[in-house]
């Protein structure tokens, strides 16, 4: 699943409108909707704000698998 789909699911699961989340991020509803459509990249500072708000990890929002990061061995 893409991060923008996860953003939308989190918002809906928490019964929030795009306007409410946009206000949290100090942006407009129109601009926030473009995050959910994948038309604008999500800035890191917004990612951090959303992680704290929804109480999830950045890995979760970014759709990364649990466990060790790609390409890293245990011996590093």
Spans of model-derived segments:
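Short, charged recognition helix plus adjacent turn
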Residues: 62-76
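Short basic helix-loop element that most often maps to the first helix and adjoining turn
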Residues: 5-24, 49, 74
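Conserved hydrophobic/aromatic packing and binding residues within compact polymer-binding modules
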Residues: 7, 21-22, 32-35, 61
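Alpha-helical DNA-recognition elements
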Residues: 34, 38, 49, 67
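DNA major-groove recognition helix of helix-turn-helix/homeodomain DNA-binding modules
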Residues: 26, 45-60
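Recognition helix of helix-turn-helix/homeodomain-like DNA-binding domains
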Residues: 25-41
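Hydrophobic side chains within well-formed alpha-helices
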Residues: 3, 7, 57-58
